Curated annotation (Swiss-Prot):
Organism: Bordetella bronchiseptica (strain ATCC BAA-588 / NCTC 13252 / RB50)
Protein name per its UniProtKB record: Type IV secretion system protein PtlE homolog
GO biological process, one term: protein secretion by the type IV secretion system
Stretches of the chain forming a coiled coil according to its record: none
Disulfide cross-links: none
Length: 233
């Protein structure tokens, strides 16, 4: 049975100390539990941020593309040109076609080989408008015409460095022209030139079937100028 007797002051005081000690211990344990909960919350939040960062990086990596650039240097002249990769969407069919005809025309007009001169001469005439064709034919009637100047002992080789279609029927072609002795003796002489060409298609003129095979689109140069590139020795 419970003791019905009241507690003495000393007993009451001792009991208060015991209850206070129990309350302090409970409070301490509660604070520790709260602190541990906060620590775990921060840890999980940091882990979530790290995971999201890794996912973002993994998602973005395929979007990063390294485009290689190859610098090609012409051995004889030292001319440098950039060779790059390109996607088909970077160029329209019209641009590619214009560049094709521009480079074909310039190469045929600027090179010289005694054994193929007639072929190049006829090809340049075919791809030239009347005024340009007349000027070209006249150049072969002059005393310093290429066939008289070089004869069979010299060749002029052409290497295209770049071709730019500026739109509205105008383009520029940059090229290296190298002069060599036909027998391979002697040092080669190279120089860099820029041809500025105006052109058009489907001009109303009569072409034979053989000519149409060589020039199916009726490409015709309406203006032609070639200049030595500035800054050469």
């Amino acid at each position: 049975m419970p003791d019905p007797r009241p507690l003495t002051p000393d007993q009451t005081h001792g009991r208060g100390h015991a209850e206070a000690a129990v309350d302090w211990e409970a409070s301490r344990l509660y604070r520790l539990a709260q602190s541990e909960r906060r620590a775990w919350t921060v840890a999980w939040a940091a882990l979530a941020v790290t995971a999201l960062s890794l996912i973002a990086i993994a998602t973005m990596l395929p979007l990063k593309t390294t485009i290689p650039y190859l610098i090609e240097v012409e051995k004889s002249s030292g001319a440098a040109s950039v060779v790059t990769q390109f996607e088909p969407r970077d160029f329209t069919p019209d641009t590619l076609m214009n560049q094709y005809w521009l480079t074909r025309y310039v190469a045929a007009r600027e090179r010289y080989d005694w054994h193929t001169i007639q072929h190049d001469y006829d090809y340049v005439r075919l791809l030239s408008a009347p005024a340009v064709r007349h000027d070209y034919e006249t150049s072969y009637e002059a005393p310093d015409a290429p066939d008289r100047k070089y004869g069979a002992g010299t060749t002029l080789a052409v290497k295209i460095l770049s071709a730019i279609d500026h739109g509205k029927g105008v383009g520029t072609v940059r090229f290296v022209r190298t002069r060599r002795d036909a027998d391979g003796q002697g040092a080669a002489e190279s120089s860099i030139w820029v041809a500025t060409v105006a052109f058009a298609y489907d001009r109303p003129r009569a072409l034979t079937q053989a000519q149409r095979w060589l020039n199916p689109l009726g490409f015709a140069v309406t203006s032609y100028r070639v200049d030595a590139e500035a800054g050469q020795p």
